């Protein structure tokens, strides 16, 4: 496989380029009989859509999804679901000046050396534009998980550049362009305005959470649930680090505090992030992502061209000054895809397993 498919039973194959006629995905393995309409998918795509605030790319794509197959009379048929999103606002001429050179920090250099050819328009296959089909597929997984288990997925930004964002409430997240869990985002708006004027970009940190995940999802060793979550999240453009639960903070913890005590009332903590031995505990799945600064910026930078000669690169076009601002719905989608895939795998192998004692509560705190 050439790395364009995520999942084993619930498998999502992504296709297209940033400035091609369309992008999309094919979902294989979705169970039959689930109610599904384009509106279910569109609601999630609208959360990720570009051009929604002055702090993201001004490329104005409607991201209208079309269901081409796999749904009949409003229900999934069990056959592959093909989803299409047409590109309508490309400006390929903006990239003519970098067609023969490489943007520092971008995939231009590695794509060219790997394939011997690259599409410079909007980053081609390496563009964050390709996260739209991921969100579309995630919407399908999200609906199935909610109906089957009551799983809820959510994400928020916890850091913008060097500015840490305190957690106030999940209720604030849908009401500001940063997906920030705070009521007042004026400080972050000013920060982004100054960044744009300086012709620069910044990174971000995100928190991603899944609630009501059943006990038992995940496989031992190489297909651990947390391993597959990390694998999926690293497929999100610009992600450079993934933590599960306490993550790297575990280094400074001791066994007496890191291990989540089990009581008849529930778990006393969740340093494990909802996964033990690669298998879900029934607690909240907690994931944290580190996202690097956008590599496409208007500030001049030193680089080389395809002939190995020194050159100066200035990126034109329309770009997100912080990829992390629109990453929350993408991260939720990736987590949904992984969870649905593992839920179907678990059902196939262990669906008949019945425990005499019910699982303990996720938490009694």
Swiss-Prot record:
Lyase: present as a keyword of the record?
Answer: yes
Q: What is its EC number?
A: 4.2.3.5
What Gene Ontology molecular-function terms does this entry list?
A: chorismate synthase activity; FMN binding
Q: In which pathway does it act?
A: Metabolic intermediate biosynthesis; chorismate biosynthesis; chorismate from D-erythrose 4-phosphate and phosphoenolpyruvate: step 7/7
What is the cofactor note? Answer: Reduced FMN (FMNH(2)).
Could you provide one GO biological process annotation from this protein's UniProt record? amino acid biosynthetic process
Give any Gene Ontology cellular component: cytosol
List the Gene3D superfamilies: Chorismate synthase AroC
Q: What class of enzyme is it?
A: lyase
Q: Which domain of life is it from?
A: Bacteria
- Which key words are in the record? Amino-acid biosynthesis, Aromatic amino acid biosynthesis, FAD, Flavoprotein, FMN, Lyase, NADP
List, alphabetically, the InterPro entries matched: Chorismate_synth, Chorismate_synth_AroC_sf, Chorismate_synthase_CS
Q: Which residues bind FMN?
A: 125-127, 237-238, 277, 292-296, 318
Query: Reaction catalysed?
Result: 5-O-(1-carboxyvinyl)-3-phosphoshikimate = chorismate + phosphate
Listed cofactors: FMNH2
Q: Which PROSITE patterns match?
A: CHORISMATE_SYNTHASE_1 (PS00787), CHORISMATE_SYNTHASE_2 (PS00788), CHORISMATE_SYNTHASE_3 (PS00789)
Q: Which residues bind NADP(+)?
A: 48, 54
Q: Does the keyword Metal-binding apply?
A: no
Q: So what family is this one in?
A: Belongs to the chorismate synthase family.
Summarize the subunit comment.
Answer: Homotetramer.
Record function comment: This reaction introduces a second double bond into the aromatic ring system.
The name under which this protein is listed is Chorismate synthase
């Amino acid at each position: 496989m050439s790395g364009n498919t995520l999942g084993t039973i619930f498998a999502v194959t992504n296709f297209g380029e940033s400035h091609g006629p369309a992008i999309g995905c094919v979902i294989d393995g979705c169970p039959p009989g689930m109610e599904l309409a384009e509106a279910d998918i569109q609601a999630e795509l609208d959360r990720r859509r570009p051009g929604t605030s002055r702090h993201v790319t001004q490329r104005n794509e409607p991201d209208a999804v079309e269901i081409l197959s796999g749904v009949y009379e409003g229900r999934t048929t069990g056959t592959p679901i093909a989803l299409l999103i047409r590109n309508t606002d490309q400006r390929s001429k903006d990239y003519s000046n970098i067609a023969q050179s490489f943007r520092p920090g971008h995939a231009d250099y590695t794509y060219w050396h790997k394939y011997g050819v690259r599409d410079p328009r909007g980053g081609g296959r390496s563009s964050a534009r390709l996260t739209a089909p991921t969100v579309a597929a995630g919407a399908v997984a999200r609906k199935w998980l909610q109906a089957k288990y009551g799983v809820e997925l959510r994400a928020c930004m916890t850091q913008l550049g060097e500015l840490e964002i305190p957690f106030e409430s999940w209720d604030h997240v849908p009401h500001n362009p940063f997906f920030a869990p705070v009521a007042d985002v004026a400080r972050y708006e000013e920060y982004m305005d100054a960044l744009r004027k300086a012709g620069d970009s910044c990174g971000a940190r995100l928190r991603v959470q899944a609630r009501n995940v059943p006990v038992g999802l995940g496989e031992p060793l190489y297909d651990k649930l947390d391993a597959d979550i990390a694998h999926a999240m690293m497929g999100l453009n610009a992600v450079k680090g993934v933590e599960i639960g306490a993550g790297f903070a575990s280094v400074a913890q001791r066994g007496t505090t890191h291990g989540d005590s089990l009581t008849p009332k529930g778990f006393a903590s969740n340093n494990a992030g909802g996964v033990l031995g690669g298998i879900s505990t029934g607690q909240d799945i907690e994931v944290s992502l580190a996202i690097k600064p956008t590599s496409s910026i208007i500030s001049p930078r030193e680089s080389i061209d395809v002939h190995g000669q020194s050159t100066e690169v200035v990126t034109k076009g329309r770009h997100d000054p912080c990829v992390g601002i629109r990453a929350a719905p993408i991260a939720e989608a990736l987590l949904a895809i992984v969870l649905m895939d593992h839920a179907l795998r678990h059902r196939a192998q262990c669906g008949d397993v019945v425990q005499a004692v019910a699982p303990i509560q996720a938490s009694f705190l």
